[in-house]
Regions:
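Structural detector of well-ordered beta-strand residues that form the stable sheet scaffold
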Residues: 29, 79, 101-103, 131, ...
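A polyampholytic, Gly/Pro-enriched intrinsically disordered region
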Residues: 122-131, 153-154
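N-terminal nucleotide-binding beta1-loop-alpha1 segment
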Residues: 159
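ATP-dependent carboxylate activation and anion-phosphoryl transfer catalytic cores
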Residues: 7-23, 48, 71-73, 89, ...
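ATP-binding N-terminal substructure of ATP-dependent carboxylate-amine bond-forming enzymes
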Residues: 1-126, 138-146, 396
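Acidic/histidine-enriched active-site and ligand-binding environments that engage anionic O-linkages
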Residues: 147-156
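Diglycine-centered glycine-rich loop/turn motifs
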Residues: 107, 132-133
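Catalytic core of soluble alpha/beta enzymes
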Residues: 133, 141-143, 147, 174, ...
Length: 445
């Protein structure tokens, strides 16, 4: 087992990885920008190394600085967390080339699944269904028009290297195809340094269902059930729950088995998530995330398994201790993503947290790096807390989440807590009758 792990991330996810390491008796090294010198993960780590100025490109996205910090601290392994360099194949290779263990899948699998066209082809060969779309990138305008016509409008234009809704646009009629593609190209280049696009069929009312998987790299594979991430705004997840209120036992068992079969055939190592659109009883693969997900606590709450510990153990070369029969999913879990944003305009709200009180009680978990006196930086993602609750069933879970939201105090900045209170009182949410467009079409958000 590792003696010392460098955590190449910040905020609540860095703190989450730190806690898992502590539980395993592993020392931690925090890296931070100058803006994060007082961050909680820095305060709690055994060691910390400043890796650059506030801008992410000069600190948390600076692979060379992170490697230098690992050398200075004498770390054995590097955990990339979520976002930043967690799905960067070149960084994974750099980590291994310098003699450290990358806590994640192989660079080959990161690269394979990072290219959405390649990923769809591979997944299709493995027997999972995909959304109808182009077999290759949309090159010239004429080629794009032909592809869209063959697929049938409406279509969705997507960045090959994309994620998080960036470089993506819906095209309802042929006249707007080229202008939407131009916008998506510019956004993709700015976000990912790659303006390659592809086109696929736009589904009108799908749910977003994802399956949490693990592989040992030698053909062993397990899954932890599904999560429903359909409450979204501009392709960004707002609320996640597990299990999905839309699936019956047969559909749940089928997609879990098919996902683990794909992991087994890929000989995939570590944590991964297969994301699907689900419409009219059919699943359609959209992408595989080759890392831990922000919403992983939902799966932890219904399974009782620490997924970060599983990541670390597999990366250390230990045999996968769990088999599918060992994973018993109980009750229901919901996660509300609390962002430092105005709850109506969604304008960012950085600033000083003048008062902080987290909710508690049975079945309540808060993953946050906030504390009274902490200053929320304008330089990074606005997510400041994940409020997760677990109960015996969905109705009790909703009641518990309402109670937890009422207890939660974050003063000095605006947050989306009022939005979550509203959503948990909406009739469609209470009945489980929603899709990925619901938040925008029904509530106009």
């Amino acid at each position: 087992m590792f003696e010392k792990i460098l955590i190449a991330n910040r905020g609540e996810i860095a703190l989450r990885v730190h806690r898992a390491c502590r539980d395993m008796g592993i020392q931690t090294v925090a890296v931070h920008s100058t803006a994060d010198s007082d961050a909680m993960h820095v305060r709690l780590a055994d060691e910390s190394v400043c890796i650059g100025p506030p801008q992410s490109r000069d600190s948390y996205l600076n692979g060379q600085a992170i490697i230098s910090a690992a050398i200075i601290a004498g770390a054995d392994a590097i955990h990339p967390g979520v976002g930043f360099l967690s799905e960067n194949a070149a960084f994974a290779e750099m980590v291994e080339e310098h003699g450290f263990t990358f806590i994640g899948p192989s660079a080959e699998h990161i690269r394979m699944m990072g290219d959405k066209i390649t990923a769809k082809r591979v997944i299709q060969e493995l027997g999972l269904p995909v959304v109808a779309g182009s077999d290759g990138p949309a090159g010239s305008d004429d080629e794009a028009r032909r592809m869209a016509q063959d697929i049938g409008y409406p279509v969705l234009v997507k960045a090959v290297s994309g994620g998080g809704g960036r470089g993506m646009g819906v095209v309802l009629e042929p006249e707007s195809l080229i202008s939407v593609m131009a916008r998506c190209r510019a956004e993709a280049m700015a976000s990912f340094g790659d303006d390659t696009l592809y086109i696929e069929k736009y589904l009108g009312h799908p749910r977003h269902i994802e399956v949490q998987v693990f592989g040992d790299g030698d053909g062993g594979a397990i899954h932890f059930g599904e999560r429903d991430c359909s409450i979204q705004r501009r392709h960004q997840k707002v609320i996640e729950e597990a299990p999905s209120p839309a699936l019956d036992a047969a559909a749940r068992e089928d997609i879990g088995a098919r996902a683990t079969d794909a992991v087994r055939k890929l000989r995939y190592r570590g944590a991964g998530t297969f994301e699907f659109l689900y419409e009219d009883g059919e699943f359609f693969f959209i992408e595989m995330n080759t890392r831990l997900q922000v919403e992983h606590p939902v799966s932890e709450m219904i399974s009782g398994v620490d997924l970060v510990r599983q990541q670390i153990s597999i990366a250390a070369g230990e045999p996968m201790a769990l088999r599918q029969a060992d994973i018993v999913l109980t009750g229901h879990a919901i996660e509300c993503r609390v962002a430092a944003e105005h709850p109506e305009s969604f304008a960012p709200s950085p600033g000083l947290v003048s008062e902080y009180h987290a909710p508690g009680g049975p079945g309540v978990r808060v993953d946050s790096a906030l504390y009274t006196g902490y200053s929320v930086s304008p330089h990074y993602d606005s997510l400041v807390s994940k409020l997760v609750v677990h109960a015996d069933n969905r109705d009790e879970c909703i009641m518990r989440m309402r109670r937890a939201l009422d207890e939660y105090v974050i003063s000095g900045i605006e947050t989306t807590i009022p939005l979550h209170r509203r959503l948990l009182s909406e009739a469609d949410f209470l009945s489980g009758d929603y899709d990925i467009h619901w938040l925008e079409t029904r509530l106009g958000l």
